[in-house]
Amino acid sequence: MTVRGRTSMSQGQVPYKELLSAARKAEPQALEMLGELVRFPSCAARDHKTIVECADHVEAHLRGFGYSAKQFPTKGSPVVYAVKDVGAEKSLLLYHHYDVQPEDPLDLWKSDPWKLEVRDGRVFGRGVVDNKGPYVADLLGLDLLERSLGKLPVNVKFLVEGEEEVGSVHLGDFTRENASFLKSDGAVNEMLVSTPGSPSEIYCGVKGDVYFELKAGGSPTFPNRDVHSGYANAIPNAAWRLIWALSTLKDKDDRITIDGWDALVREISEEDRAALTEYSEDLGAALKADYGLGKTLLGREGLELVESVFMSPSVTISGFGSGYQGPGSKTIVPCSASAKVDFRLVPDLTPDKAEELLKAHLVKKGFGDIEVTMLDTAFDPSKTPITDPFIRLVRECSSEVVAPARCSVLPMGFGSGPVELFARYAPTCFAWSRADSSGTNLHAPNESWPVGSLSNEMAFVALVAQRLGSS
């Protein structure tokens, strides 16, 4: 790609209200584009042909809006990446993904998940929130800004991958070979802004994540097949063995008891603790209302709950399987058992270190026979300093969309993602903006987004690009 000489931008500023007005007029176009994308059942774990077709469509989208767009082939889904170099001094990178969660269970959908439907002021379809809707909104929002000013105030880069929902398995191949593309003056990860009056959160980083499968069985310690439970006092039970092993990982007060774990958890800085203290939402009330809880785990509330969710590591049994699970009864001693365990990591824990500590802990506790396998792609935690100017810029923009008192900046998000794959090869400031997701049914049937959120997102990304260009 030929890079033109850099020039300083001197265009005027378009007020947010004008950006929002233009965005609302563009809603029909946004819905049409989103409908075209929703019709692709682009599930990375299922149908490679549809994934490729969706990637081709995204590439064509970007080319149609004047971007120099390409595909990076991988052993899985292709990565679509695009640049619009206007010769500006600064560059903005936007990360999105075109793959989606499967539609299962289909019978719980009130409309076809692969056909966009608008009803009751909301747009329904798989991927409208995660993440095809935000991608369309960002693409159109930047186009609106370009047409308003005559020229974009920043160079814009889009990275749209196709494996986010399965752990970004091959994204590292792209980031390793395209460090120059990743360089920017600010990057946003799945930017998603709230509707006015609802809360908005800006994360300066994300937790790491590593997923293990633990197995008992398959050795002479256990029977080579399920056994009549009349022999229960004579035959080792793989299910009990695995349950006892898992019980050593945490105590009844929810403390992780893996030897050496706490020593690797970085102390919370004064700046980060101050941000947690200023968190504007009642997290406990929100969680209880959303999930029908009488109380949170251990009754945590206030700052204790906020710190535990956003700044603490976790060990979670995500699934357990053993023995007979069918209707009625079957009296057996199981010969095998397995569990899926999810570890969320904070600095300075890493997936490799977590695996090392877990295996050593099990051996020390007398469970060296438990087989430990790391599954899928693992991510290191990644964090931008909360004092970074780009973080401040994104917060200022978000505060114009929602009430300033409802906009919070948090040192890290509660989730995980491939941010560290970017930071590893081209250090840059990542801001992950997250809206109030209640009612969106993310990863569930009837995924939906308020129609007005499309225009809010368009105006928001235009405002971010405009402010970055003049900063």
List the predicted regions and their residue ranges.
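A structural supersecondary motif
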Residues: 299, 303-335, 342
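Zn-dependent metallopeptidase/amidohydrolase metal-coordination segment
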Residues: 22, 215, 222, 242, ...
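Fold-level recognition of mixed alpha/beta catalytic cores in primary-metabolism enzymes, strongest
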Residues: 120-123, 128-300, 306-313, 447-457
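Acidic/His- and Gly-rich active-site-bordering loop/insert found
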Residues: 10-126, 147-154, 341
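Short amphipathic alpha-helices in soluble, non-transmembrane regions
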Residues: 354-362
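Short, low-order "capping/linker" segments at domain edges
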Residues: 381-400
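A short beta-alpha structural unit
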Residues: 39, 343-346, 371-387, 411-414, ...
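Short, conserved charged micro-motifs
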Residues: 348-354
